[in-house]
Amino acid sequence: MPPVVIYTTAWCPYCIRAKQLLQRKGVDFQEIACDGKPELRAELARKAGSTTVPQIWIGETHVGGCDDLHALERAGKLDALLSA
């Protein structure tokens, strides 16, 4: 399974929903908390073109945010991406 990285903040309901989906699927992920860390927000802007959270990567693939992750799941494409 490729590494999964998710940038989050503690108060973000979309971050919680994205993490819950990954946890339900038994996915280990690295969570990078951006709370009060402008340098991480700047890193997000460089990597994702956005500073909104969550931002999720599966391996080298930038998935996007919570809605994007759930759309992959609904389309039946998330498992394939996780097992690549």
Swiss-Prot record:
GO MF annotation: an example: glutathione disulfide oxidoreductase activity
Intracellular or extracellular location(s): Cytoplasm
Keyword annotations from UniProtKB, A to Z: Cytoplasm, Disulfide bond, Electron transport, Redox-active center, Transport
A single cellular component GO annotation: cytoplasm
Any Pfam family hit: Glutaredoxin
Superkingdom to which the source organism belongs: Bacteria
Residues annotated as domain Glutaredoxin: 1-84
Disulfide bonds: C12-C15
PROSITE patterns: GLUTAREDOXIN_1, GLUTAREDOXIN_2
GO biological process terms on file: cell redox homeostasis; cellular response to oxidative stress
Record note on quaternary structure: Monomer.
Stated role: Has a glutathione-disulfide oxidoreductase activity in the presence of NADPH and glutathione reductase. Reduces low molecular weight disulfides and proteins.
Similarity comment: Belongs to the glutaredoxin family.
Protein name in UniProt: Glutaredoxin
Species annotation: Pseudomonas aeruginosa (strain ATCC 15692 / DSM 22644 / CIP 104116 / JCM 14847 / LMG 12228 / 1C / PRS 101 / PAO1)
UniProt lineage: Bacteria, Pseudomonadati, Pseudomonadota, Gammaproteobacteria, Pseudomonadales
